[in-house]
Amino acid sequence: MRLVKIGLASVNTTVGATHANVERALRFAREMAAADVTVAAYPEQMIGGYPPEDLIQWQGFVEDQWRALEHFARETREQPTVHVLGVAVLHEGLRYGCAAVVAGGEIRGLVPKEKLPTYSIYYEGRTFSRGFPYQRGEHRGVPFGDVIFRFDFGVVAPEVCEDAWTTECPMRRRTYSGAELVVNISGSAFRVGTDQTRREMLITRAGDHQCTLAYVNLVGGNDGLLFDGGGFVFQNGKLMLDAARWREGWEATTVDLDRTMRLRSENTTWRMDHTAWAASHDPVPTIEIPATEFRTRREKLTYPVPAHGSFLLPAPEKYVPARTRYCEDVLDALAMGVGDYFEKNRVFKTVGVALSGGRDSLLTLLVAHRWAARKKPDAPGSLLRAFYMPSRYSSAETEKAARTVCDELGIPLRVVSIDAAFERELEAVRAMLQPGEPLTQLTEQNIQARIRGQRMWSWSNSSGGLFLQTGNMSERAVGYTTVGGDLEGALAVIANVPKTVVMVLLDYLQETHPLEGIRLALQKPPGPELAPNQVGEEELMPFRVLDACFHLFADEKLLPEEVERVVLTMFPDLTPDVVHGYVTKFVKMFLTSIYKWVQAPLSLHIGNLDLDRERALQLPVVTHAEWALKKK
């Protein structure tokens, strides 16, 4: 047996906090070394934080990462552990994201990332250069390039995140060159369903390349990107460790690398592919780390025994319904996003939400409370502030819902009418209009929203509070929001959450954590209450139809007539004329609302589609719907 203990450390980093990030990692390094971990893996860009965006263009930022890496090496000198961690370097005038290998107080090598994602929410090709096969060099006297490492326990191949997300991956040539343990350090942002995609992809890679594959992910929120942490260890396609997500910390498992090599020798397909590859390729160079120079501590390791007491029977699994997994993932992601934005900015004293008594602001408050309950379990409400600012159009039902949920959660609520300010603003606007120019009903509605937005900013300035914006993705997509009003805030919590998902999340929360305030909010049809008897679906369309149009047009990029055909199939009770009207209305509103998206605050990203300009969907502000709505 060749037993190796693999530790996966999900570290919650802050971009730019190089030495603070290293100190967080060192705490885990000491704990893992004390637990006889042989190889410890940390996330991509762990030292500088991820994503650094254009901050990486500052040479001083990159240089400081090297100093922090040297500090990490010095502090781990006496540890019998190989550490693999992420760092950015400036090598021969180019910037690379690398996996650094540290052992025995020395930086043993740097392996640059080869696959640079420049799609969806990622822009690495903008600032980073890619490594390439058989690249060799030295960086400050340290081996740099496409290399693998031989230690006293076996051969390790470090790689970075996207390098595993393609069949043409460096893992192939490195395992054919003798690597037994592949360590993938990652900064893979959360999107709904991504965890399952990662699992399936990585277990396939470990099986295809007949290796032990250790994968660790970054955890925490940085700007609008949310990282769910966790990690896996797969041995030749068999799951050995599934580390917990949504928390900072480390987990470890022991594997027998002799088993990896035995399975290779028994797999004729792998052997023949290896022989064919070796006939036309040179092996990847191996950096030898002699045992006289560095030795791991593996004497006390024990063979991995199934916790359920059988090598033959499957381990019992706790069944979790798909809806529960979905809702918990989204809620955990959003709560972490609020908390890390609050804490990492280091300027806020409290969190504020303007409640309307409706669904969106209620969900935003519940998400903030979810974070606060973990941050301060004894008094989560002390971190939060809520405000209800009624006008003549606000209903008694929404005020009751707002008061009730705040009472139940222990959140201080202030009720401050906007009626007097509304009257003053109406008079001021009338005075600005030309004779005969009417003050429109839409203007009256927007004035109310803008008074509330202005007051929330004033509260934020005076209290040092984080002002959370409460709008959902569906209504932002079609511009059903007021610039300077309900579009205001420092952080948009649910701006990447479609309206139908908002409703599902509230239903789920009411089932799992029943509150009278949620029940009251769900009783009333959703609407902004800026005019008498205002109902959102009557002014727009049924939200299920709107979200279908949004997905098909914005995400799938279908033409309007194609959207109509799909919507008719989804909703057979609707007539073709009605569907045509809905789709036409959606496309017009969508393409004429882009100017609002670019003025919206930063939003938390949970899906593959995002309206933040620098994320997944980048559209010109000045555009026309002519191409989409030509008469056939």
Language model: regions and residue ranges:
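ATP/NTP-dependent adenylation/nucleotidyl-transfer catalytic domains that generate, transfer
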Residues: 5, 16, 21, 152, ...
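Enzyme catalytic cores with a strong preference for nitrogen-chemistry domains
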Residues: 1-354, 370-379, 408, 413
